[in-house]
């Protein structure tokens, strides 16, 4: 599915369209469709951190045309390491997707309001052994 990027992704401001695809039951991929060939691996945060919660600022809600009835998904970018346990998740910049109109944004959260969220939080912190 092709998603329209409604607000620039940090470091990838020229990207306006991305291809969304499922990797497996845990991970998905966003691949750039605009010039530069890059992709992100994302994770559904609720699979590893069920208490993950944040408010989507009104600005982003308007960009996505979100309503309480919207079919919305939230993912977080994963930095893949040699092992899954060493891989990190960016909980400070979730990707919000409105499946009703195929739009997406990366929401940048304020560390003052979300002191327990980090840019590079190891997945090992959330995997039960």
UniProtKB/Swiss-Prot annotation:
Primary location group: cytoplasm
InterPro entries for this protein: Flagellar_assembly_factor_FliW, Flagellar_assmbl_FliW_dom_sf
Keywords: Bacterial flagellum biogenesis, Chaperone, Cytoplasm, Translation regulation
UniProt key word Protease: no
One of the protein's GO biological processes: bacterial-type flagellum assembly
Disruption phenotype: Cells grow faster and are about 55% less motile in a swarming assay, flagellar filaments are severely shortened. Decreased levels of flagellins FlaA and FlaB but not FlaC accumulate; 3-fold more flaA and 4-fold less flaB mRNA accumulate in mid-log phase. In double csrA-fliW deletions, flagellin levels are slightly lower than wild-type.
Cytoplasm is among the record's keywords: yes
Cell compartments where the protein resides: Cytoplasm
Superkingdom classification of source: Bacteria
Entry GO CC: cytoplasm
Subunit structure: Interacts with flagellins FlaA and FlaB but not with FlaC; recognizes glycosylated and non-glycosylated FlaA equally. Interacts with CsrA. May form a 3-way complex of flagellin, FliS and FliW simultaneously in which FliS and FliW do not directly interact.
Family stated for the protein in its record: Belongs to the FliW family.
Chain's role: Acts as an anti-CsrA protein, binds CsrA and prevents it from repressing translation of its target genes, one of which is flagellin. Binds to flagellin and participates in the assembly of the flagellum. Overexpression leads to increased levels of FlaA and FlaB, but levels of FlaC remain stable. Involved in post-transcriptional regulation of flagellin biosynthesis.
Protein name in UniProt: Flagellar assembly factor FliW
Gene coding for it: fliW
